[in-house]
Design a protein with these regions (language model features):
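Glycine-rich, low-complexity intrinsically disordered segments
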Residues: 1-102, 106-215
Length: 215
């Protein structure tokens, strides 16, 4: 088989790529639901998965697909001023447009309409992102305490202070507030004030629209 098969899609509160956390795990409050495609909704396929606390997701950068690719990219963590090899970064602009994320598995729901649904936290995926594979995270082999982080070691982590008026928070679904504020304060790549403000506005606007749709 030459083509990868989409086995599932994740549903999050992030409808566009500009608000997605720069890495998985940076916003542990951000919730998502993984819904399998009809051909893969057999409950037997997830038997035993509930015994694991974390999962690996292999997915597609569906919002950043390009026909060509560049051997070097400008990582946002370096301010966009220094080029690094694409395989030395996690840039979405890769030959195969594949992403890898580690998420916490909160629970496995058995839905009559959708089959097994995985409720996860800490994902860095846009709503509707196609998933190619799901694997359990194995601490004894996947954790490397002596790992070296290359150019990311020693970089300062910046956070935004976000103040949201109570009347605005009330218009956002209660189960989405903590994750949204987590994205705005610590999940975004360091940017200029103007760009950050635009991202904040975009995220708030998108969630307000979704809040209206749920009513």
């Amino acid at each position: 088989m030459d083509a990868l098969q989409v086995i599932a899609r994740i549903h999050t509160e992030l409808p566009e790529k500009f608000g997605v956390p720069r890495q998985s795990g940076l916003v542990p409050q951000l919730r998502g639901r993984i819904v399998f495609e009809p051909a893969y909704r057999n409950p037997e396929a997830v038997r035993g998965l509930e015994d694991f606390s974390h999962l690996w997701l292999i997915w597609q950068f569906s919002g950043a697909i390009r026909q060509d690719w560049s051997p070097t990219v400008r990582p946002p963590r370096l301010g966009g001023n220094r080029r690094m090899g694409v395989f030395a970064t996690r840039s979405p602009f890769r030959p195969n447009h594949l992403g890898l994320s580690s998420v916490r598995l909160e629970r496995v729901e058995q839905s009559e309409a959708l089959g097994p649904v995985l409720h996860v936290c800490g994902a860095d995926l846009m709503d509707g992102t196609p998933i190619f594979d799901i694997k359990p995270y194995l601490p004894y082999t996947d954790s490397h305490p002596d790992a070296v982080g290359g150019f990311t070691d020693g970089l300062e982590s910046r956070c935004l202070r976000v103040e949201c008026p109570p009347q605005l928070l009330e218009r956002i679904p209660a189960d989405s507030r903590e994750g949204l504020l987590g994205v705005l304060t610590g999940g975004l790549t360091a940017t200029s004030g103007g760009i950050a403000a635009a991202v904040v506005f975009s995220l708030l606007a998108a969630l307000l629209v979704r809040a209206k749709e749920k009513r």
